[in-house]
């Protein structure tokens, strides 16, 4: 009668307990990997947000300045269409003041601050001021 109840009470073969152990090991591995991935993802999200929060003020000021420069040149170009130099400068400004040109790593220190004024923006501020002097004063 003891043989009849052996499998009910867990006194089965070695292979069954080995299979259970392998299943538990596999399940543990899956959970560990998932936990690791969750931790990495959460860390990336948190650091990405922190980087965005730190860099946004600088980026927004630069973006505003670029918009102001391009907008001024476009307005002047619309009124003074015969000025070929203005047209050429506008095309150059639109290339040089693209986001990927203005927001390059080399322009910023480790704290994401500019060391002084942005050289490309400074160049175009002077050019735009020249056109403002020529046409608006």
From Swiss-Prot:
Residues 35-75 are annotated as: deca-GX3 motif. May form a complex with LTO1. Keywords: Cytoplasm, Nucleus. The keyword Repeat does not apply. Pfam families: Yae1_N. The keyword Cytoplasm applies. Its main location: cytoplasm. GO terms for molecular function: protein-macromolecule adaptor activity. InterPro entries: Essential_protein_Yae1_N, Yae1-like. Coiled coil: none annotated. Residues 1-20 are annotated as: Disordered. It is found in: Cytoplasm; Nucleus. It comes from Vanderwaltozyma polyspora (strain ATCC 22028 / DSM 70294 / BCRC 21397 / CBS 2163 / NBRC 10782 / NRRL Y-8283 / UCD 57-17). GO terms for biological process: protein maturation. The complex LTO1:YAE1 may function as a target specific adapter that probably recruits apo-RPLI1 to the cytosolic iron-sulfur protein assembly (CIA) complex machinery. May be required for biogenesis of the large ribosomal subunit and initiation of translation. This is Protein YAE1.
